[in-house]
Regions:
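N-terminal pre-domain/capping segments
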Residues: 1-110
Length: 111
């Protein structure tokens, strides 16, 4: 049976860089990490191949398992969590969410 490691989300560490957050999670004794998109901390629209390589290296170095990539709930609007959602009646808004989820899948494949 597949065991999901006890993990911590980088969403709670947004004042650190994503690399610093990986080290902080490892230092705290967690086995896994949720890499959470955040406008200033881990912005899916600004992720480079270099950063993905650095993330892979930090995870490997610290023995941390990436448990999840989180697409944010407040990424597009602070006033309405989860909007635009996949159920948004506005087609352009729904396409924004779909694009964000696709970016999360690509990041998951890369790390």
């Amino acid at each position: 049976m597949l065991k999901l490691p006890l993990s911590y989300s980088t969403f709670g560490l947004t004042k650190l860089s994503v690399i610093e957050a990986i080290h902080a999670v490892a230092d705290a004794g967690y086995e896994g990490i949720e890499l959470a998109f955040h406008k200033t901390h881990f912005n899916p629209f600004n992720i480079t191949d270099q950063l993905l390589g650095d993330i892979r290296a930090a995870l490997r170095e610290r023995g941390i398992v990436p448990a999840c990539i989180s697409s944010p709930t407040h990424f597009f609007t602070d006033e309405r969590p989860h909007e635009p959602s996949l159920f948004c009646t506005d087609i352009a808004g729904r396409k924004q969410r779909i694009d964000l989820i696709r970016r999360a899948v690509k990041v998951a494949q890369a790390v």
